Amino acid sequence: MGKKRSVSSQRWLKEHFDDQFVQKAQKKGLRSRAVFKLEEIQKRDKLIKKGQTVVDLGAAPGGWSQYVADYFNGDGQIIACDILAMDPIAGVDFLQGDFREESVLEALLERIGGKNVDVVLSDMAPNMSGNGTVDQARSMYLVELALDMCHQVLKPGGSFAVKVFQGQGFESFLKDVRAAFNDVKTRKPESSRARSREVYLVATDYKL
């Protein structure tokens, strides 16, 4: 007999399959419901424009890369990275690996080829342990790495959209993002679950 699911996992499964955005993604043949978060950000903030170079961190299963590729329709470059495998997407150059490792980071930077990126996207999140303090520290480490990637690859005037979990370290990170970009907004997309602490920082006009 299989292991009995916990009350919390049963609740998550019910929420997941009752979720209108999960159902909408399935009907449209999309890779994940996360695409609707980026779609809403794009409608409000106009981050992505044809002809740009976009880096997608934490890309698997590919919802955001798929959205950008469809938007570009061949006019633009997308470089994606994730520790998990991702089915190929036309127009997306995908690197599988953990970019916290030096060799993977070097390979990713080589593909990017210098400070010529218009937009860095990050929907990264750690594997949750259930320990809130540990999970928050891990998630803040990932967003700090994403900001460091901006410093290495973004053009002046470039943009950054990053998922952040509110909690310890959030205000300090927000201050760092504001120091690097002239305009920073906090977004809570409609498709983000209400009880989730996740928000998205949308930063434009990179100045460093």
Curated annotation (Swiss-Prot):
One function term, GO molecular function aspect: rRNA (uridine-2'-O-)-methyltransferase activity
Enzyme class: transferase
Gene3D superfamilies referenced in this protein's UniProt entry, alphabetically: Vaccinia Virus protein VP39
Entries under Pfam families matching the protein: FtsJ
Enzyme Commission number, as recorded: 2.1.1.166
InterPro entries in the record: RNA_methyltr_RlmE, RNA_MeTrfase_FtsJ_dom, rRNA-MeTfrase_E, SAM-dependent_MTases_sf
A Gene Ontology term for the protein's cellular component: cytoplasm
Function statement: Specifically methylates the uridine in position 2552 of 23S rRNA at the 2'-O position of the ribose in the fully assembled 50S ribosomal subunit.
NCBIfam families (alphabetical): PRK11188.1
Protein name as annotated: Ribosomal RNA large subunit methyltransferase E
